[in-house]
Amino acid sequence: ALMVVKVMKIPEPWVISIDRTDWRFGKTVFNVLTLGVVHHGIAFPLVWIMLDKKGNSNTRERCELCNRFLEIFGDRKIDFLTADREFVGEEWFDYLISDPCTRFRIRIRKNTLLDDGQKQLRADVCFQNLQVGQSKVLSKPRLVWQHWLYIAAMRLDDGDLLIVATAHDQNRAIADYAKRWAIET
């Protein structure tokens, strides 16, 4: 991991991205949780965990991966972490928001309940009037998994909503989240 960073001369602050994927080699399937740094549109995996199970990761596994990353790269400046809809939940957000805080841009599901302090609405209801290509940031934070977070959304070309939760820099949330797709490279 240190060699990759040194050879690639990846400048700080870093955008890091967490993902889980299945790698198939013949009849063998490896379930891999990975954390990489995004550089020139490519996510370079720096740390990973082989999950001895099928399906999604849990908060303990994610925290273990992030802690391993911090052991190696704790002195580096991180701009933010991006993650897809799998990487949500109260304990996970507790970890990210704890000291030291990891700024994040995390996609949430359209059926996630957003609480404004008076009522709860599904995220997709809050953004139902968006047209393709339009984006919107809710003016005030919403309670999501016991944390007050800003919510931004954009209507994608296929009609789906891209909905992103963040605790910081909400007006950059959608553009920043786009860097997450690099982990798929």
Segments from the language model and where they lie:
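Single, function-defining residue in the core of a domain
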Residues: 1, 10-14, 25-28, 39-185
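An active-site-proximal beta-strand-loop segment
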Residues: 19-32
